[in-house]
Structures are given as C-alpha cells and as structure tokens.
Curated annotation (Swiss-Prot):
Native species: Chlamydia pneumoniae (Chlamydophila pneumoniae)
Signal found in the keyword field: yes
Signal sequence coordinates: 1-30
Predominant cellular place of this UniProt entry's protein: membrane
Record's protein name: Putative outer membrane protein CPn_0818/CP_1053/CPj0818/CpB0847
UniProt xrefs under NCBIfam families: IV_pilin_GFxxxE (TIGR02532)
Lineage per the UniProt record: Bacteria, Pseudomonadati, Chlamydiota, Chlamydiia, Chlamydiales
Coiled coil: none
Subcellular location as annotated: Cell outer membrane
Keywords for this protein: Cell outer membrane, Membrane, Signal
Domain of life from the UniProt record: Bacteria
Length: 123
C-alpha cells in the first residue's frame, strides 16, 4: 500500500501574522523616512543659499555694481551666471519658497537664508 504524502500548507492565521509584521515594519520605516526627507530638504536649501551667495559675490567682485543693486537684480544676475544652469531654481528653497537675500547689519556683506530652514533650526 502506498502512503500518500500530506502537504503542509500555511494556515490563514500564519499568513495574517506575517502580513501584520510586514505592515508594522513598513510603518516604522515610513515614519523614519519622514525625518530623512526633511533633513534632505534642509540640506538642499542650504546648498542653494551657498551657491546664490557665491554667484552674487562674484558679480560684486567683478562688476561695478553695489551690493544693493545686485540684490535688486538678483534674478538676472543668477540667470546670467555662466556656471549656473537653472538660476531661477536656485533662488527657491526645497519647499518652493523664495530665498531671502539682504545686506548684513554693516552693509558690507550679503545674508541669504530660507525662512523654513531657520524655523526648523530653532526647534
């Protein structure tokens, strides 16, 4: 007589436990990704500020324009920079808001910042 081999299959409860564990792990990863995405946006905004500062100060060093004139025409200065491809995008932070470009208290240097980055650094 031949004995039939019995296949062992996964029960419904075992399958539900596995799916629940996958959901819990996925939720934890998604929660941690939110912080990483925010840090990435802060980094991108800081890099944009640094690039805009470099472009505007190079214009100040090479041209006969004052810092006030450069601030007034910052869009055209950044767009016409030969080593910058998409100048308009540099003048925005990672959230799509305009960067703030102004003179420092002494009036001899530029201060470039993003309101969102400053508010997140205060927290």
């Amino acid at each position: 007589m031949k004995r039939q081999k019995r296949k062992q299959s996964i029960t419904l409860i075992e399958m539900m436990v596995v799916i629940t564990l996958i959901g819990i792990i996925g939720g934890a990863l998604a929660f941690n990704m939110r912080g990483s995405i925010h840090k990435g946006k802060v980094f991108q905004s800081e890099q944009n500020c640094a690039k805009v500062y470099d472009i505007l100060m190079m214009e100040y060093a090479t041209g006969g324009s004052s810092l006030k004139e450069i601030i007034a025409h910052k869009e055209t200065v950044v767009e016409e920079a030969s080593w910058c491809k998409e100048g308009r995008k540099l003048l925005k932070d990672a959230w799509g808001e305009d960067l703030i470009v102004q003179l420092n208290d002494k009036g001899d240097d530029l201060v470039i910042f993003s309101k969102r980055v400053q508010s997140s650094n205060k927290k």
